[in-house]
Amino acid sequence: MAGLGMIFEETYLPVFLSTTNTPFWVPQVGPVHARLKSLYSRTGIRGKEILSKHGQKLGNPENHGCSSPPLPGLDQLHAVLIATPDDRHFHLAKEALLARKHVLIEKPSVLSLQELDELEALARKNGCLARVVYHKLLDPDHKRLRTLVHDGIMRSVRSGYATLLEPKQISTKQFSEWIHGRNPGTYVAVHYIKLIDFTFGASSGSKWALKRVGATGQRGIAGPANGKTWDSVQLRVEYAYPDGREAAFDIHTSWVNPDCFPGYVDQEVQFRFENAIWLAHQRKRGVELSIEGMTPLLIKETPNHHYNSELLDPWNQRSRQGYGLEVIRRFFGDIAFLNHGGHDSERDARLTILRSQEWCDLSGDRNTVAIVQAMEGILQAHANGSPGGVVTVNGKAGGLVLCLPGDPVRKVLYNGKV
């Protein structure tokens, strides 16, 4: 397990606490034990804290402080799970795949199509599973959204927006170590980039194509007003249907909002279809409470019980029920199926079946990574004094081409086809 921060604590840790001593069942294989062998963090301090609290329940995994390759004990592992800051994903995943280890990467998988191409090629060459986790695809609301689209009940999305706001304590405290030179679009907007691309594209059968990406943003709180660390980002993504119609989506993200707003995060979306409108607001679908001296700072007024709360079951066992945990269990089960679900001569056929899962395989992440790479390129140009850029997709000049106002020279971000 590489990366031991909030994502590990809220998603991976609950899984390992349940699977270390209790196997889960895979029909083609039988009982599967998923054990945490190694903890990797830059200093090892976070690993010590985890072991002091959960070491015995986790089977006392080894703790390693390593700020650069190689990963100690890699040869003893079957898979590497990566939940580090996004600009460290590629090198960790590459090292694991070179060692013929399966990888599961937190969103976004990587920051450029060049990196995605390299990881995909390594996974194919070495017969490994290479997957990316987008937990919001497992949100019950989003499962319902996809079901209505897949079944043709809501048809042909035309436009929409999403706003995703996080408090200043995220950027100034929790993530302050790594946000220098980063932006909330790549970290937060990517949830909805993938949701839109997968739900309205692959799931609907429409076979639309990514056409244009635009972005702008603001600076001055998380970093200098003329620097490369962004407070908020406004992203626009445009697609084209085969019949020439287009769809456009605006995704606004910020991680410098007041700490005192009612929820842990504030997320609102609207999607407008040919025959329907979908509206969703994360804070308005659940519980509201007030506790003197605790809300809204220590405990939020609209707690997110379905994701990150610790709950006491009727039988007095504490657990976290968060959505998306099944993705991790499924990854372990699919590794077991790949390696033990039949005769060795049929392994390639099993691998082909597993790689066809567009929602999680790296091969299904092309549009998402393309949008991230385009956004990063636009914001980089903005920080360098050239705002207002637009990236065109799969045009005559290349797969991703950055066009800046008043500049006749086009910058090719990615030559191949997206």
Feature map (PLM): residue ranges:
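NAD(P)-dinucleotide binding in Rossmann-like oxidoreductases
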Residues: 243-329
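Rossmann-like dinucleotide-binding domain that binds NAD(P)(H)
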Residues: 172-266
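A short helix->loop->beta-strand "cap" motif at the edges of active sites that frequently abuts
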Residues: 99-101, 126-128, 245-248
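N-terminal glycine-/serine-/threonine-rich beta1-alpha1-beta2 phosphate-ribose binding loop
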Residues: 1-99, 117, 121-125, 351, ...
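Short helix/strand-capping hinge loops at secondary-structure junctions
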Residues: 100-102, 106-108
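A contiguous active-site-proximal alpha/beta segment in oxidoreductase catalytic domains
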Residues: 110-173, 182, 192
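C-terminal helix-rich "cap/oligomerization" subdomain common to oxidoreductases
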Residues: 79-81, 330-418
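Redox-cofactor binding/interface segments in oxidoreductases and associated redox assembly factors
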Residues: 81-82, 105, 162
